[in-house]
Amino acid sequence: MRSDMIKKGFDKAPHRSLLKATGLKDEDFDKPFIAICNSFIEIIPGHKHLNEFGKLVKEAVRAAGMVPFEFNTIGVDDGIAMGHIGMRYSLPSREIIADSVETVVNAHWFDGMICIPNCDKITPGMMMAALRINIPTVFVSGGPMAAGKTSKGEVVDLSSVFEGVGAYQSGKISEEELKDIEDHGCPSCGSCSGMFTANSMNCLCEVLGLALPGNGSILAIDPRREELIKEAAEKLKILIERDIKPRDIVTEEAIDDAFALDMAMGGSTNTVLHTLALAHEAGLDYDMSRIDAVSRRVPHLCKVSPASNWHMEDIDRAGGISAILKEMSRKEGVLHLDRITATGQTLRGNIAHAEIKDKEVIHSLENPHSEEGGLRILKGNLAKDGAVIKSGATEVKRFEGPCVIFNSQDEALAGIMLGKVKKGDVVVIRYEGPRGGPGMPEMLAPTSAIAGMGLGADVALLTDGRFSGASRGISVGHISPEAAAGGTIALLEQGDIVCIDVEERLLEVRVSDEELDKRKKEWKRPEPKVKTGWLGRYAQMVTSANTGAVLKVPNFD
């Protein structure tokens, strides 16, 4: 066993003595040592219940004849961090989480690991660590939140609250109505109830094969999630016995399948960023053009909030992720069904008995929302290395208009609220990329303000930053190269005409190459917004969005 490094031999007497101080007995040194990587944090509703989950996982690990050791990671609630400097720490927290998990697990030579994540950057951070460490691992998330209902019976979620702010600002609802939405938008523990980033990543974790069937859709408060925890411990023991590791599971084909599910569900654009980072950790050269190839062959089968009024509980009721995958498998070439997963079975085996139970929620191949996926990769002179749009969250497929430029999210939100943006405009928010932000903050407040004011179909928004999974409308993010790297987005001037063509996958500014070259020569890189602390270091090390915004290792040659 890997853990023999710290528990076997006469020279490990000091190690055993320390371990006995934690409560271990001599007989425990013949059992596998299991890291329980938890993320219990009281300020995050998706993680508030995970202390109880941790106890259940430890009980299940002991029952399976192994020895559990629980530790915790940090986390950031993107909703609470939204709209202020806290959002700059969100994406960078992914790297801290990955590094901290790597540190604890490799320092103590565990034989296997069960990860308990739930929300936005915590799930991908742990997944990155699992691929980096590469010991048998199973994920079991905290589960989605239920949708809420206002006093009038209207189904609401967190995106409803953000959009309610814009609706109140424009006089469309009263303060009392906004308070009603606020009070009922987040009714329980769990990850926010729509197809936002947290749920998108937990669903992708399931299809990748690192989590068990049901992980993405079973609600946090559903007793079936406790059964999932017990099964996770049993499956981990099998993975250890068979020496099946994360890098055996997360292959190029698995990543194709993850993006295929993402396209079928119209998941968060953040999944592109995080899954590219996973490919990097797995040692795979996975190009963004491959994502677009997946999008072209995968139909969009279900729309979940914010693209519809359906929520994760509806997906679960309709058959869950397995039902979506089973339907997708009917189309040749969409999924790689014979690859191994954390169940010890193939993907084909995992979904063999699944079926769609509500075709209003999960459409059939014969009745898709669209023939192509709900995410698209755009390229052009404004995004030479690519950009991402959640095409499933807007009916508008082509938009052209003059750009209104803001050099920060705060500046943009103030401008939108003051009426500086009108129908037909293309809002540009730049210098908010991985390096320029720093931290590539999400633009949920501006998109929600635009939607809440009734301009969601009449105003486009471009940024080198990110969008929340709760964002909708004509929102193009992850523009690469970013402004801070001298990308074309930095060269735009007020009134330049920008064209977004979703069907043709184009993002262009109607300015000649000669004029852009002239502007590039005159452009000067702004001073970094942050020069000290973690964000200062992050800005110096982070790479572009088109490579997953991972940190580059300095070259010491």
Swiss-Prot record:
Q: Quote the record's cofactor note.
A: Binds 1 [2Fe-2S] cluster per subunit. This cluster acts as a Lewis acid cofactor.
Q: Which InterPro entries match?
A: Dihydro-acid_dehy_C (IPR042096), DihydroxyA_deHydtase (IPR004404), DiOHA_6PGluconate_deHydtase_CS (IPR020558), ILV_EDD_C (IPR056740), ILV_EDD_N (IPR000581), IlvD/EDD_N (IPR037237)
Work out whether the entry's keyword set contains Transferase: no
What's one GO BP annotation on this UniProt entry? L-valine biosynthetic process
Summarize where [2Fe-2S] cluster binds, as residue positions: C119, C192
Modified positions (N6-carboxylysine) in chain numbering: K121
Q: Which GO terms describe its cellular component?
A: cytosol
Catalytic reaction equation(s): (2R)-2,3-dihydroxy-3-methylbutanoate = 3-methyl-2-oxobutanoate + H2O; (2R,3R)-2,3-dihydroxy-3-methylpentanoate = (S)-3-methyl-2-oxopentanoate + H2O
What one GO molecular function would you report for this record?
Answer: magnesium ion binding
Q: HAMAP family given for it?
A: IlvD
Q: Give the protein family.
A: Belongs to the IlvD/Edd family.
Q: What is this protein called?
A: Dihydroxy-acid dehydratase
Organism, scientific name: Bacillus cereus (strain ZK / E33L)
